[in-house]
A protein has these predicted regions:
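Hydrophobic alpha-helical segments and their boundary regions
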Residues: 1-2, 21
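Cell-envelope and extracellular/periplasmic
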Residues: 16-223
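Bacterial N-terminal signal peptides
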Residues: 2-11
Length: 223
């Protein structure tokens, strides 16, 4: 059982995804550039966790909390130490997933939790976020730590999907649609393969994305 989403699939990025398999703990990262980590998104609104969702001990942005993945705690949002980042997209997404699951499969919802993390980097190209670079390693570290913590807690663990909020930098750099498509396809396939290798899951990792259709180039003015 699970929830049906219209998403980008690892092997077929423009198709209709099958229902993802949900385990006890489900790793859900918010990935991309600045919006994915809550740039200027203040005040924060998720100050109390009402759906049982989780984050690592270091916070929803673990890189701000010393990358402390030694335990899980209730998912809440906070302002970054430098004051630049606030509410990330992952809390709203996880909360809505849980509310939808409670409507469609209330019996299963009582056992399901999302383990959330915001691992993006502001102002970078999709290339910087691709496999082999430091931001991507955050996802691998989350996966490994999540699997170990879930095992200790006697919980099943998988990665059903990730949130993707990126594209403004590549649009500014005049990258073509075909170039971006291939980069995106490779990223989804890499995350899918690595998640399966860590968790042992059979189901594909799905991707929620958005379209940067009307973005003005940085520092441009709207006449």
């Amino acid at each position: 059982t699970g929830v049906l989403f219209c998403l980008l699939m690892a092997g077929s990025p423009y198709g209709l995804a099958e229902k993802p398999v949900l385990t006890d703990w489900n790793y859900l990262p918010s990935y991309g550039q600045s919006l994915s980590v809550g740039w200027t998104a203040k005040p924060v609104v998720t100050t109390e966790q009402k759906n049982g969702n989780l984050m690592f001990k270091g916070g929803v942005r673990p890189f701000e909390g010393g990358n402390d993945r030694s335990a899980v705690i209730p998912l809440v949002e906070g302002v970054s130490p430098d004051g630049a980042r606030g509410e990330t997209p992952v809390s709203g997404a996880a909360g809505n997933f849980m509310r939808l699951l409670k409507k469609r499969a209330s019996g299963k919802a009582s056992n399901v939790r999302f383990l959330c993390s915001a691992d993006g980097v502001g102002g970078v190209s999709i290339g910087v976020l691709s496999k082999g670079n430091a931001p991507y390693q955050r996802i691998l570290d989350d996966l490994t730590a999540g699997r170990e913590l879930a095992s200790k807690a006697g919980k099943s663990f998988s990665m059903p999907c990730f949130l993707w909020t990126q594209g403004e930098t590549d649009q500014q750099d005049r990258k073509t649609g075909e170039w971006y498509k291939e980069k995106m396809r490779a990223l989804i396939q890499d995350i899918d393969a690595d998640a399966k290798a860590v968790t042992g899951q059979k189901n594909d990792v799905l991707c929620f994305g958005y379209q940067v259709a009307s973005h003005l180039n940085y520092f441009a003015r709207n006449p």
